[in-house]
Every structure is written in C-alpha cells, then in structure tokens.
C-alpha cells in the first residue's frame, strides 16, 4: 500500500472526478478508517482533473499531472514520519475515506518509503453523537510496576480499548498472556487508579496525553505487589460518577500513596469526600494532589495540572474560580437545591456537579495543585470539540461552561412559550423591561443573576427608513480591536545576475493588498523594477504556486517560503523571452520496487530564455550560466571533450547519432505522448537514466553533461518527454516545466550544497522594526463596538416593510450591565486564506472602570467596575499558551496562574498584549459593606495594594482613558 508508481492505468479525468466526488461525500462512521493526504498534492490533483472547477480548459494537461501521492509536507521528521503539530484540516491536509484512498493509490501510487497516514473515526458526545477523524493519536507513557523508571511511549486511538493497551504492554514488557496482570492509571506522583474494565475505550477511561500507565504482573504465589494498596482503596470512600443513581461502585479503584516498599504503602493526601452517584461516566472523580496536605496553602491558590494542551481550560477555570459571587454559591452548596436534571437543554446537572467538586477542591486549602482530569472528561462528553488534546480557545470554553452551568442550574423547570413583540415606536424603557422580563421567564439561574446584561440593537432600512429596535441578553461582551492596516513580510529576492546570492528582505505591505504591492515595496528597497518580478511560493524544492500580480496577499500565509525572482520579458537583442520553471532532480539507483527513482533538491529556478530561438544547446548554456555560482563546470580533459562541444546530445556518454525528429511541440498541443515513466518519473527497471537516450543514438563521440533535461509536470514528479537533441529549435512556453536530472556522483562532485543555500540579509532584516503605536485604550474598543455599521451583502436584514433583505445600518448599544462583566478582546481574525492574531496592547484599568458613559439607558445606576481576573494567551492563532492573573477574594492580592504553578504577581504585570478575556466586578453597595480585604485574616497576612501601587485611589472612579 505504501509504494506506487510505474506505468499505471487510470481512467480519464471525468471518470476520476466522478468517482472521487461520490466517495468524498461519504459520511463518517464510528470505527471507519480515513486517510490524510497533503492538501497541496490534492489541490494539484483537483487542477489536473478539473475537480470543483468551472474552468475545464486545462484539464488533463501533462504539466498539471500530480505524480505519486506525496505527504512529506505533513511530517516533522521524514524518517519517523511523525506528523507536524497543529495541522489544520483542509488547509494542511484533506481527509479521504478508504475507498477513495485506494483509488488514488491505484491511479497515482505513493512516494517511495512513505506509509499511508490512516486514522480511525471516533465518536463523541453523550446525547448528540458526533463523529470525527482522530488525526492525532494519544501518546501514553507505559511502564512495568517493578521498574517505574523504564518508561516507553506508545500512541493509541481514543477508540482503542484497555484490553488493546494491555496486550501491547504485555508485548513490550515480556509478560506472558497466561500470567495474570493488572493495569493502573498513575497520575500526579502518588495516585493510582485500577483500570479493571478492559472493554472500556481510552476515551471512556479519560486517559490523557502523557498519561502514565503501569502494568502489575501477579506474583508467583498469587499475591499482588500492590495488594496492600488495593485493600486500602476498598475501604476508603471515593467520589465516583456512575452511569446511574442505582449503579454500584466504579470499576476504577482510586488509591493514593507516596511510598511503596515490599507491597506496603503510606497514604498521603488523597482527599475523598462523600460519594456523588448521580449521572456520570463510570470512573473515579477524585482530584488527588501531589504534596501532602498543608495548612499553609491559601484557599484558592490551587494550580491546575496540564493534561495535554489543556492550558486554555485551566486559564478559564482560574478566572471563574476567582469570581467571588459564583464561587461562594458553590462553596455554600446553594447549587444543590437548584440543579435542574430535567432540562432538555442542560446536562442533567453533571457539569454543575463536576464544576462544584473541582471548585471545592481548589478552595479547600489542602492542595497546591490538582489535576482536573474528570472535569475535562465530563466537558468532553457534552462538548465534543473539547474532548481531544488539541489547543482550544479559553473564551470558547468559557462560553460553553457558562451556558452549561446556566442550563444545569436553571430555576425554570418548564419554559413558557413567549411571542416576541416589535417595539413599534414604544419607549425604550418599556421595550427593554419587557425583553428582560421575558428573558427571566425562561432563564433564571445564578449565571443570569451574575453575568447577564442587555444589548440594544437598532436597524434602519436604507430604502424605506423602517427602524427596528430590539433588546437582547448577553453573557459576555466581545469587543473588536482596531485592525492592523498592514503586515510585515519576509521574502527572498533572487536577482537575475547569476553571481549574486539571493537576498532576504523585510517589507511592509497593505494587509489586504495585492501581490503587486509586495513587488512595489520590494522594488523600492532593491532598485529592481516591479514589472520584472515574479512571486512564488517554494515548497519541497518545487513551486507550489506562482502568483499573478493581481492576486491578494491574503493567499500568502505567514509560514510560506516566498521567493521573488527577477526575470526578463525581452532578451538583449530585443527578442521575446519566456520564463521557465526549472527543478533540480537527482536520479537515484532504483530499488526493486516500482516507486519513484528521482528526488527533487535545491532551490528551483525561474529562467528567462528566448522564446523563438531556443535550442537544447543554448538552453543548457543558459542554465549553466544561471547556476555557475554554486555549480562548477568539469574540465575538458575530465571527459576528453568540452561539455559544451557543439553537436553534443542530450545526456549521452557514448557515441551517438542524432535522429531525425520533428520540432518539439508543447504538450498542450497534444502531439506528444507520455513517456513510460509518466506516473512516477521512472525509467524501465534496471536501466541507467542516460540509457533511454542512448538507445536512439549511435556514431560520433559525445561529451559528458552535468545533467540532462526532462519536460515534467508542474510538480516535477512525472516525466512528460525528453527534449529533442537534434539541434532544432525547441518550442516551449510559460506553461512548460523542466527538470535538470543529475546522477548522485555528478551532484556530489560539482554541486556546492552550502553555496546553493547561501543568501545575504538586506539592511531591512538587520534593523529593528519600527514600532508603530501598538496600544489602544479599552474605551476605543467599546466605541468601535458601538459604531454604526452597514451590514454586508452576505449578512442582510429582512425588512418587514419592504418584504425583502436589505443591507441595513446597524448600531449596537449597552442598555444594562451585569455584576460580573466579562470582556472578550477579539484578538483572532481569520478567513479562508488568512489567520492572524492581533498583538495590540489594550490599556485597561485595574480599578475604577467607569462604564456609565457607554450605557444608553439614562436612568441606569452607576456602572463602576474593578478588575478581578484576566485570561492571557501567548503565541499565535491555534498554538501558544494560556495563563491567568486573578485577585484572591480573601487577601486582595494578585496571583499568576500558569497551569499547576501559582505565584504572587504585581499589578504592573497585568496589562500586556497577551490579555485576552477580562473579568470585572461591579461596585455595589453590598460590596463596600463586606469586611476590608486587608483584615480578612488570610494565612499569608496579605494586604491590599496601596494607592501608590495602584496609581488611583481605591474609591476614585476613572474614565476609561488610562493615559
């Protein structure tokens, strides 16, 4: 399955398109196998057969032939074929079902040595089942009980069973099948769970990335090395979630120990409280800590272990944990009387219970950090998007959690049907009150009490001037950031002068500009005319894409390797030139397989040559001149004649006689047939690359050439024809692609690898980038949010007067604000081609945030807020790391939460470009009646920061201008 190539029979383009099109509509089924294909290869195949394209003019052209399936771009390590991290579906790879893969493999083959990337379909969700392909397998750490230092890594699907893991561990640690053994799930440093239900899947068991599993073989006398531990676990109460209220104890025994000697254990922290048996998934929900209990741990200063890319969850949880009204509600067990198990929109109270258990553990004062493993598993059951171990968005997790807690704790048991009324010119106060009361009739929970506010939206029809006013509840405020107007790109300029190295430039271009803008910017720095530039994306030693001048720069991703080539439209004598893509290929000695016998290397060329006066000899000379900086020419006496001797044939070492051939026509004219190497760029088994030509030639001596030419497809993976060696003119155009074929010996002798990769750095790369204003005030973001806008053509409003959709004007305003105001800074922006994160520093006040001026309800109460928490994101979109700053409600001090680590923080650390979600608490009358934070009697004797540290007096409400 892994290899392919050779001369292959394949149906015509229309048949391929039809057969694959039907298969690509296959629905995901649990347990089915799907295959990953590099999206670049797949896009090339789509061009070749005209898949999903209205332009059928170039369908079937040989230069578009994709060659064998090549997934090398998906691997971080070509040898182990380990997938790169953070690959994105459709952008980096496409998924095809088994039958589609088999057809493509049969038609095109696969690059030599590459194994298929096959993955299983797994199912997520408790009520609504959701299937997805598990692209990244779960890495587990495996060890044997008697030697815990010998840890081996293995990858498993979440659909694999515990029995599958046991079988693999027996093989790894040489444990016979007839010998009894037990599996233990080890987390933190001293907590073990027995995995006794072998038919459970990895997903059912809640195993996570990097989880340590221990296999314990039975002693010869029938006892178990950990027997004492098991005995203790059978008497210790544990918090278990079981599948029904009447279920028996979980099959997973939870054990805590810190010292194991001769089968004995010393129990340390393993805190267990009364059991919770309502709902659940059949595993222990204990949150056991690493350190022994300590009376010196400040409640709330509890870190959360990273279970594998779960920092986004930890960040959101720390912010919510330090939201005093919500945390007090759970610590006082007020939630127990309000759990709504019958709400069809809820999760039977299980999310509320899981969250309550975690909050109680975090505020117990006994644990320095806990592993929120069971909480994450519960979340993943109801929200499949969070079930894996890929990086997610802390704000999206926060939105799900607030909504889930609300529905689990909704005091409304039966939601009434309400008919919405139009404002019809009624006063805003009346319409807003009606909207809020209607909202509370269906939604009444601690989340609504604490987090919900009211928007006012005004829409005006541009045609009939109809005004529509609505009031809608919100749980968090998403604020846009002023968009960057430009972007910085780093590109390589390849000059036409063959003696000059490529130069790397850093240029500033319009964010939504065109390729021509890039060329103009580069022209200003280099002095080369923009019209003489061609911009290309180089990938795996080939041109992935050659851009047109009017194409948008949003098609170019930040990670693309962009080369800009200086080309000529006319030659020195004024004749018309054509620019040809030229690849370096090494012909390798063929193994017995039928896979490709050549490999691309080096940086490809864009070569300008005469369009109407080109012979093989002049082409060879032009290429030799172009690569003379890093390719030395053989001396005449090395081969007995000059390498440029007139009449030399294409690549022959022996005597030859040029055959009479017709002038070569370009492949699109249909006069050439594919050579026998069409499918993979191969020769007949056992042949020398040059022998193909030698079969046709006899007679006069012919010198050695450094390389031979082949006309190839645009990927350089399939030969179309050899070039005529009879001295006649070549007919090539801009759609032609050439390959220089080298043998290994010649390449090692004459090709300077180091010099070929060498480049210069322009001063623009050496100078520090000019820092434009990178800060905005929070008030600027709010003003942008409340600015009137015109709806886009794809997002129109239906006007009831005009009876049609209109691009109305829309204005959003704030009508009422909640006790806890959650502000989401919209840092991430993306479209089909472009993904970006705005690293703008948003200046937000730590205290005294006065929102009153932005509330359009003139009779509203004062809205003054103090910051209590911040969720931070470091890095780029889809990757990076999440942390949190939060203010402890007991001692008034700020702390930095970085997964399991908690450290004291100062206020001047909080406002950074990483701030992503802000939590503000409203100043209410009752807020000031509480005991002062400095006298809270905290264990560390913390005091509230002084006004000099704060920059503002405690009671001084500032406007949002922080300058």
From Swiss-Prot:
Interacts with RB1 (both dephosphorylated and hypophosphorylated forms). Interacts with RBL1 and RBL2. Interacts with ADORA2A (via cytoplasmic C-terminus); the interaction is direct. Interacts with SART3; recruits USP4 to its substrate PRPF3. SUPFAM superfamilies: Cysteine proteinases (SSF54001), DUSP-like (SSF143791). GO terms for molecular function: cysteine-type deubiquitinase activity; metal ion binding. Residues 384-386 are annotated as: Regulates ubiquitin dissociation. It is an enzyme of class 3 (hydrolase). Phosphorylated at Ser-445 by PKB/AKT1 in response to EGF stimulus, promoting its ability deubiquitinate RHEB. Residues 302-923 form the USP domain. It comes from the Eukaryota. Residues 11-122 form the DUSP domain. Residues 244-255, 932-948 have a biased composition (Low complexity). It catalyses: Thiol-dependent hydrolysis of ester, thioester, amide, peptide and isopeptide bonds formed by the C-terminal Gly of ubiquitin (a 76-residue protein attached to proteins as an intracellular targeting signal). It comes from Pongo abelii (Sumatran orangutan). Belongs to the peptidase C19 family. USP4 subfamily. PANTHER family: UBIQUITIN CARBOXYL-TERMINAL HYDROLASE, UBIQUITIN CARBOXYL-TERMINAL HYDROLASE 4. Gene3D superfamilies: Cysteine proteinases, DUSP-like, Phosphatidylinositol 3-kinase Catalytic Subunit, Chain A, domain 1. The modification Phosphoserine is found at residues 445, 655, 675, 680. Residues 27-216 are annotated as: Necessary for interaction with SART3. The completion of the deubiquitinase reaction is mediated by the DUSP and ubiquitin-like 1 domains which promotes the release of ubiquitin from the catalytic site enabling subsequent reactions to occur. A motif (Nuclear localization signal) lies at residues 767-772. InterPro entries: DUSP-like_sf, Papain-like_cys_pep_sf, Pept_C19_DUSP, Peptidase_C19_UCH, Ub_carboxyl-term_hydrolase, Ub_USP-typ, USP_CS, USP_dom. This is Ubiquitin carboxyl-terminal hydrolase 4.
């Amino acid at each position: 399955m892994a290899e392919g190539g050779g001369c292959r029979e394949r149906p015509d383009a229309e048949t391929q398109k039809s057969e694959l099109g039907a298969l690509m509509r296959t629905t995901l089924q649990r347990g089915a196998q799907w295959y990953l294909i590099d999206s670049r290869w797949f896009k090339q195949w789509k061009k070749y057969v005209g898949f999903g394209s209205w332009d059928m003019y170039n369908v079937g052209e040989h230069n578009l032939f994709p060659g064998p399936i090549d997934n090398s771009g998906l691997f971080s390590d070509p040898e182990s074929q380990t997938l790169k991290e953070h690959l994105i579906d459709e952008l980096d790879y496409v998924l095809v079902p088994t039958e589609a893969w088999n057809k493509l493999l049969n038609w095109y083959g696969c690059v030599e040595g590459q194994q298929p990337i096959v993955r299983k379909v797994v199912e997520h969700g408790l009520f609504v089942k959701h299937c997805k392909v598990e692209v990244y397998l779960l890495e587990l750490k495996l060890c044997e009980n008697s030697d815990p230092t010998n840890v081996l890594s293995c990858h498993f699907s979440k659909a694999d069973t515990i029995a599958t893991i046991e079988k693999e561990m027996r093989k790894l640690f040489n444990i016979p099948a007839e010998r009894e053994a037990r599996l233990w799930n080890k987390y933190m440093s001293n907590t073990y769970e027995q995995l006794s239900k072998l038919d459970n899947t990895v997903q059912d068991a809640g195993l996570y990335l990097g989880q340590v599993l221990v296999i314990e073989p039975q002693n010869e006398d029938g006892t178990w090395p950990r027997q004492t531990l098991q005995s203790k676990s059978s008497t210790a109460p544990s918090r278990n979630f079981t599948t029904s209220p009447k279920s028996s104890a979980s099959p997973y025994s939870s054990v805590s120990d810190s010292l194991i000697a001769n089968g004995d254990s010393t129990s340390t922290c393993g805190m267990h409280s009364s059991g919770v048996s309502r709902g659940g998934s059949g595993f222990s929900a204990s949150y056991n800590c690493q350190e022994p209990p300590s009376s010196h741990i400040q409640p709330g200063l509890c870190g959360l272990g990273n279970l594998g890319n779960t920092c986004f969850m930890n960040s959101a949880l720390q912010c919510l944990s330090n939201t005093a009204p919500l945390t007090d509600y759970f610590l006082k067990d007020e939630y127990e009387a309000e759990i709504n198990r019958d709400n069809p929109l809820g999760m039977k109270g299980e999310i509320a219970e899981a969250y309550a258990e975690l909050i109680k553990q975090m505020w117990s004062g006994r644990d320095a950090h806990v592993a929120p493993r069971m909480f994450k598993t519960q979340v993943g059951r109801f929200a499949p998007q969070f079930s894996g171990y890929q990086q997610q968005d802390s704000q999206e997790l926060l939105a799900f959690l607030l909504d889930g807690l609300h529905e689990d704790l909704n005091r409304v048991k039966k939601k009434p049907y309400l008919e919405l009324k139009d404002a019809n010119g009624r006063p805003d106060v009346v319409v807003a009150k009606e909207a809020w009361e209607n909202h509370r009739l269906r939604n009444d929970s601690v989340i609504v009490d604490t987090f919900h506010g009211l928007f006012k939206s005004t829409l005006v029809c541009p045609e009939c001037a109809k005004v529509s006013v609505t009031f809608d509840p919100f749980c968090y405020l998403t604020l846009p950031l002023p968009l960057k107007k430009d972007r910085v790109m780093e590109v390589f300029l390849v000059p036409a002068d063959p003696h000059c190295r490529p130069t790397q430039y850093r240029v500033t271009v319009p964010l939504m500009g065109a390729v021509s803008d890039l060329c103009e910017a580069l022209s200003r720095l280099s002095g080369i005319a923009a019209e003489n530039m061609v911009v290309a994306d180089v990938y795996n030693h080939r041109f992935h894409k050659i851009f047109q001048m009017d194409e948008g720069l949003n098609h170019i991703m930040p990670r693309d390797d962009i080369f800009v080539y200086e080309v000529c439209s006319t030659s020195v004598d004024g004749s018309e030139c054509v620019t040809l893509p030229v690849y370096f290929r090494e012909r390798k000695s063929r193994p017995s397989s039928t896979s490709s016998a050549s490999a691309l290397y080096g940086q490809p060329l864009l070569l300008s040559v005469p369009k109407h006066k080109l012979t093989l000899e002049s082409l060879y000379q032009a290429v030799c001149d172009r690569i003379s900086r890093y390719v030395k020419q053989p001396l005449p006496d090395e081969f007995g004649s000059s390498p440029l001797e007139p009449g030399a044939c294409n690549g022959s070492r022996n005597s030859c006689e040029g055959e009479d051939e017709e002038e070569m026509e370009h492949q699109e004219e249909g006069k050439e047939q594919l050579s026998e190497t069409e499918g993979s760029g191969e020769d007949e088994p056992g042949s020398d690359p040059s022998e193909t030509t030698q079969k046709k030639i006899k007679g006069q001596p012919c010198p050695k050439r450094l390389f031979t030419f082949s006309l190839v497809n645009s990927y350089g993976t399939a030969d179309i024809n050899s070039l005529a060696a009879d001295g006649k003119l070549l007919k090539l155009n801009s759609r032609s692609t050439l390959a220089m074929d080298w043998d290994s010996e010649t390449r090692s002798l004459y090709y300077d690898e180091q010099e070929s990769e060498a480049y210069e750095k322009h001063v623009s790369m050496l100078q520090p980038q000019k820092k434009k204003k990178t800060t905005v005030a929070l008030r600027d973001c709010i003003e942008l949010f409340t600015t009137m806008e015109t709806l886009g053509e794809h997002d129109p409003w239906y006007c009831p007067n005009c009876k049609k959709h209109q691009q109305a004007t829309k204005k959003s305003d704030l009508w009422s604000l909640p006790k806890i105001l959650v502000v989401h800074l919209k840092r991430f922006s993306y479209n089909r081609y472009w993904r970006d994160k705005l690293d703008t520093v948003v200046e937000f006040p730590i205290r005294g945030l006065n929102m009153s001026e932005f509330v359009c309800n003139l009779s509203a109460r004062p809205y003054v807020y103090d910051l209590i928490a911040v969720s931070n994101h470091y890095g780029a979109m889809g990757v990076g790391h999440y942390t949190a700053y939060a203010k402890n409600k007991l001692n008034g001090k700020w702390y930095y939460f970085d997964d399991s680590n908690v450290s004291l923080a100062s206020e001047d650390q909080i406002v950074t470009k990483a701030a992503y979600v802000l939590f503000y608490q409203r100043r209410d009358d009752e807020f000031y009646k509480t005991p002062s934070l400095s006298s809270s009697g905290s264990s560390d004797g913390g005091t509230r920061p002084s006004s000099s540290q704060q920059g503002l007096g405690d009671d001084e409400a500032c406007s949002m201008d922080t300058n």
